[in-house]
Swiss-Prot record:
Short chain dehydrogenase/reductase; part of the gene cluster that mediates the biosynthesis of the phthalide-terpenoid hybrid 11'-O-desmethylfendlerol. MfmJ seems not to be involved directly in the biosynthesis of 11'-O-desmethylfendlerol and its role has still to be determined. The biosynthesis of 11'-O-desmethylfendlerol begins with the NR-PKS mfmB that forms 3,5-dimethylorsellinic acid (DMOA), which is then transformed into the phthalide 5,7-dihydroxy-4-(hydroxymethyl)-6-methylphthalide by the cytochrome P450 monooxygenase mfmA and the hydrolase mfmC. The keyword Oxidoreductase applies. It comes from the Eukaryota. The keyword Electron transport does not apply. Pfam families: adh_short (PF00106). It is an enzyme of class 1 (oxidoreductase). Keywords: NADP, Oxidoreductase. Its EC number is 1.1.1.-. This is Short chain dehydrogenase/reductase mfmJ.
Amino acid sequence: MVSSKELPPSTVPFFPNQFFRNQFRSKPQYPPPNTNLSEKVAIISGGNTGLGFEAATQLLSFKLGTLILAVRSTAKGEAAASKLRARYPKATIHVWKLDMSSYDSIQEFAGRVNTQLPRLDMVILNAGVSKLEFGTVSSTGHEETVQINYLSTALLAILLLPALKSKSPPGIPGRLTIVSAALTLVAKFPNRDESPLLPSFDNPKYWDPNDQYCSSKLLMHLFLWKLVDYISADDVIVNLADPGFVKGTELARDVSGGQRVGLSIFASLTGRNKKHGASTYVDAVVNKGKESHGGFIMSWQIHPYPTLLYTSEGQQITERLWDETLAEFEFANVRGIIESMKGN
């Protein structure tokens, strides 16, 4: 199969064409019924609610051996784990603290993976936010949506790469799926010409709640385009998965009033159910092979990246974003980690 980079950019309008095709004409793809994950170890961030919890349920239904729910609230995580343990008593289920708004917490979590897990097969980075009001994370000064959806997720992904490479069985690549969104295809990205780029997302003059969410997900596309040049699909398969528009999730938990009512009505008419939405994660991390490395999976199919990435402008932005992101993470030796992934 052809990878996302090798596909030509799509010329089909997202609204209404691709949106309604995604929501009503796409067929979910589940692992074969005899799939056995009994020896495997998986991590899901934000796995205590919504699509993360549903993805956990689906993996456990295929006899997943060990599951780690990476959650901000361990109390809520344990409540979710109790439900899963009751349903799947043969599985080993742990709850580990992970605060995606804290670089210290992210580093502590990755360190725990390195020291406490003898094996790691798959990771689904599902935690994300969609903020209605502008706000910043006190410890970093960055706007919350970009901090959680892009910066913190990118840092965690990089820190987990060595474990996915070294702790998966010989000859079997580790799997890393980062949850994305089809809305990247319509991101306006009004601050794309700013230099430096990342601080411009912290400027309220560019703030729009809808586009900030879209742009935060687009940043991960730009970053992954470059990152996979350093990672062999023989070591770790890294991809992006879009769950589609799903009803009943907590992504829009900060939405209130009339917007919440309108969104609920629209979701009831067009939204996928959680089972179908979460199956996109499971498909990406279990079904898809090396052809999905560095790819964007939308509606269970490998899809082109947003058009911007195929342009000279997009490539220039990618290089700027790459340099600024690695500089942001200098404290965590990410350059050394990324370089180490190129070795045998």
